[in-house]
Amino acid sequence: MRKSHIILVSKFYKKITFCLVILLLILQRAEIRAQSLPALQPFIFQTKQLLESLDFLGTPIAVNDKSKLQDAINKNDTLNTITDIEDILDKYCLFNVEINPESRVYAVQGAAKPELWQNGWQTFLIKIENQAGITAKIQVLSPQAKETFGVFGDVRVNNFTQGVPAKVTAKDVTDRWMDMNLYTKQPMKQELSSMEVEYFIIQLYSRDAGKRKARFNFSAGEATEDLGFRNAVDILFNCRQSTKLIFHVLDENGKPTTASFIIRDKQGHIYPSQAKRLAPDFYFQQQVYRKDGEQMALPEGKYTFEYTRGPEYLVKTKTINVSGGAPPSLNFALERWIDPSKLDWYSGDHHIHAAGCRHYETPSEGVDPADMIRHLFGEAVNVGCIL
């Protein structure tokens, strides 16, 4: 055999060997992947529950993705069905969490676009690969989601339910711009199911507009955090400016006044979020007060406004669709059912504790008169004395 022929045969066998090695690696990877897949029936069942919950929240996945999911389910082929479902749902995941066989939690940022709305809730998914097969509760914490309760100046109003609270500084308030909710209402749960792969729903709220960063810490029971903060994810969000609404509030005589408003979306979220309110809006009550001509920023969506002005006025409701464009004017006409002042009866509270009793020690702490006067006007209280 000629030398040139020997060289050609040698190259041919090298190519064949290389192709066989690649094929073997692919088959091994496919086998490992198949071993790590959840059982098909419960995975499809959980996927359907996830879609039902997203529909209920008013945040369904895209129509074409829902159609692709149904096509994947109809395949009834474990490897292809599960892989196709994951490929579709992973686009909506802000977090990918892995629990290794030793139950250590590791987290990274997912493929979803980190975008929020000022004063609005945004829904994302969390993908969890549970290699340990544990059934503990999944927990998510963030220092940016800590309380800003009762911050006036540079301290917190004491509600005396859990002892003397730590001070919350103005810097803390700036950093605590976010609220967070792991959605666990039926059919979703907070506990892991022990399936190898499952998805959770998380909702995030931004108090602010602009660029904001947050850290998220994941755990699944005690001592499950991975070493080196690998269970923590830092994400930079783009928080879009919401639509500013102009309130026009008139009393029974058609004169401008102040009223109480409880604002809800169809999921029951209260706006602005009570956890992120700053004076003059207070965290310990659902309502906020707005006088004629004032504004509030809300993201696009449908809201129910419940408004009144204390016990002398009827409680009325109005459904409002907020969309982009020019700031809409919202008109609220109050309706009084009784006027005790015509019988020489006047309402009042001459003993208003603005910060429990701490203001006896530090008069600067608590609610300022300028903030409290809005509440008095909004409840049609004739006399109010702040201690």
State where each predicted segment sits.
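A short, solvent-exposed beta-strand micro-motif common in secreted/extracellular proteins
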Residues: 261, 300-310, 376
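Short, ordered, surface-exposed loop/turn motifs in non-cytosolic proteins
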Residues: 253-278
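Catalytic cores of extracellular degradative/oxidative enzymes
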Residues: 312, 316, 341-387
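Long, low-hydrophobicity ectodomains and other hydrophilic envelope-associated domains
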Residues: 63, 74-239, 382
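Extracellular beta-sheet/turn segments enriched in Thr/Pro/Gly and aliphatic residues
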Residues: 230-239, 320-343
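A short, amphipathic beta-strand motif
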Residues: 243-252, 261-263, 303, 332
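Short, solvent-exposed S/T- and G/P-enriched segments that are highly enriched in secreted/extracellular
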Residues: 186-191, 195-203, 231-233, 270-296
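Structured interaction patches on ligand/partner-binding surfaces of diverse proteins
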Residues: 287-290, 295-298, 311-329
